[in-house]
Structure formats: C-alpha cells, structure tokens
C-alpha cells in the first residue's frame, strides 16, 4: 500500500507586536520637529529609555551643517543598530540629496543583511521617523521595516499614532501655515495627550527642532512639568468656553466680561511661559559659567594654549610697543 505524500505546510508568520510608544515628526517651511516619549515596557516592568537620537557633523550648527535626527518605535536594540548604521553612512555625504539617499539606502541594506541572519518570522520590528537637515534644507521621512517614504507634513508611529493623527488634523487643517515653534508646542501636546490616555506611553517628552537656517534646539525632558501643567490648565479653561459658545439659552455667559477674562487668562499663561524660559536661560548661563570656572581650577591643562600659539603671541608686538615705535 502506497503511503500518502506528506503535506508541506507553509510556515506561518509570527504575529506582529504592537509598538508601545509614540514617535512623531512635523514639517513646516522653517524646518522639522521630532518628538517621542521615553517609557519602555518589558513584561510588567517599565523603564525610561531615550527613543529620540540626534547626530550632527559640527558643533556650530550653521545652515550648511549636517544634522540627522531619528525617533524609533519597536525593538529597542534594533532601532539603536539602525541609527548607528544610518549615521555612519549619512555623515559621509557631501550634499543634502546625497545624505537623504544614503539614509534610505542604509535602512534598506540593514534589513537585507540582517534579514538573512534571523530565522523566518523572527526579524525584529522597527518603525522610524527621521529627518535630515543640510545646506539650508530639510526633509522628513518615515519607514516601516525596509520601506522608506518622504512625508510632506507629518509622520507618527506607535500605539499613540491614531490619537496623534486626530489631534494634528484637528489643529492643522490643510489651509493653515505654522511656524517651527508652533509645531514644537503641537508635538509636545500630542505626546502629553498620548501619555494621558494611551496605555504604554509615558515617561518624559523628548523633542528636537531642526531649523533650516541653523540654531537647532533639543529638549530632553527639561520642559515637561511646566508645559504639561499649562496644557492641563488651558484644556480645563478653554473646554467649558467652547461648550458655552453654543449655549444660546444663556447668552450672558460669553459676555464682554467673560471674554475679557478669557483673554487675560491666556495672556497670564503666556507670560508665565516667557518668565520660565527666561529663568531657564539665565540658570543655564550661570551653570555653564560655574562649571567652566570649576573645570579651569581642577583641570587647568585643558585650557592651556599650545606652545606654538604661545611662541607666536610672544613674537607679535603688543599695542603699547606699536605705539612707542610710531613717530
């Protein structure tokens, strides 16, 4: 009796695990804003891990300088590996278009290389939002595995993506134009709402502004408390006013006095933000001066001039010597 042929079952792909985080990027004419939370979950344990990384070719950050920022959702070690491999290629670029091309090529090559190493269905997942700035220009990209696409306006990945997309479409209709600072506030607000309402999103808010003309700015959790307090304050104040604006049975609720009070409260909150920023700038300035003073006292050799510069300064005549020689 002939035996029946064996049935060759096609191996099933392992179920995808949903990324427990939120990473986002927003683009305007002035540049790009990237943001992310910091909470990472391992089973029942939570830890704080930076998911937004910034790489740059120069400390000066002029318009022509190269900057590369990436925020990733998914497998943490795999995201870190992609950042290292991509930056190693991008920093060799001599033009903006070449930098964008090398970033996309590096992500594809990494998935091709490591895809042959992992067993079928075991390849780690990574969804990225990254930005490239150079030569006074910038572009925003998102990737899902080896698939890379340029994004004209925004890109959001993670379990807070649906909420973030809803808030962006609500506050940024197609006919509006926002500045880089306004997009930074929007990015922080989206992460704040995701941390409040989406399980698995939490920790600090990390944010970076890549400005086309230079002067980029990174905030790794320094502004969390006061911004979240201000968001909570405005939501609680503007929400009832929004509902009351449709209450035609109580026309006196939005009288001139109430509108004036609303404007005064908004101005007060804005002034508090300015005061906090000025205090933070002054504190940072004093802290840098104190650290430099301490370092000069503890590590004087770091601030010594090379002998070539000392000999050169000694050979150059001083201003008093020049004036004495002049008739």
For the regions a language model picked out, list residue spans one by one.
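Long, contiguous, structured domain-core segments that constitute the functional module of a protein
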Residues: 134-136, 141-149
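Mixed-charge, polar/low-complexity N-terminal
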Residues: 13-15, 137-138
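Conserved short S/T/G-enriched processing/targeting/catalytic segments and their helical context
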Residues: 7, 14-124, 145-185, 199, ...
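Short beta-strand scaffold segments in enzyme catalytic cores
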Residues: 21-27, 31-35, 126-133, 139, ...
């Amino acid at each position: 009796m002939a035996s029946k042929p064996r049935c060759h079952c096609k191996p099933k792909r392992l179920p995808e695990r949903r990324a427990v985080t939120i990473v986002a990027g927003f683009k305007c004419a002035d540049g790009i804003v990237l943001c992310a939370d910091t909470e990472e979950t391992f089973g029942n344990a939570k830890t704080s891990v930076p998911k937004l990384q910034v790489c740059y070719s120069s400390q000066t950050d002029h318009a022509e300088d190269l900057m590369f920022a990436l925020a990733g959702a998914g497998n943490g070690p795999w995201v870190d590996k992609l950042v290292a491999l991509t930056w190693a290629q991008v920093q060799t670029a001599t033009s903006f278009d070449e930098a964008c091309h090398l970033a996309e090529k590096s992500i594809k090559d990494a998935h091709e290389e490591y895809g042959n190493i992992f067993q079928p269905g075991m390849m780690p997942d990574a969804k990225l939002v990254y930005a490239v700035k150079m030569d006074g220009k910038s572009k925003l990209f998102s990737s899902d595995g080896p698939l890379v696409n340029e994004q004209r306006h925004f890109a959001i990945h993670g379990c807070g993506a649906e909420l973030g997309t809803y808030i962006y479409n609500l506050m940024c209709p197609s006919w509006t134009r926002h500045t880089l600072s306004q997009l930074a506030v929007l990015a922080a607000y989206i992460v704040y709402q995701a941390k409040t309402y989406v399980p698995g999103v939490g920790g600090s808010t990390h944010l970076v502004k890549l400005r086309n003309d230079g002067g980029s700015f990174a905030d790794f959790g320094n502004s969390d408390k006061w911004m979240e307090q201000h968001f909570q304050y405005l939501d609680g104040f503007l929400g009832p006013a929004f509902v009351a604006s449709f209450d035609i049975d109580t026309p006196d609720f939005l009288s001139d006095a109430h509108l004036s009070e609303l404007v005064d409260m908004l101005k007060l909150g804005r002034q508090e933000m300015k005061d906090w920023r000025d205090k933070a700038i002054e504190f940072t300035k004093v802290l840098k001066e104190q650290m430099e003073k301490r370092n000069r006292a503890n590590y004087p050799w770091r601030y010594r001039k090379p002998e070539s510069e000392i000999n050169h300064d000694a050979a150059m005549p001083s201003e008093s010597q020049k004036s004495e020689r002049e008739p």
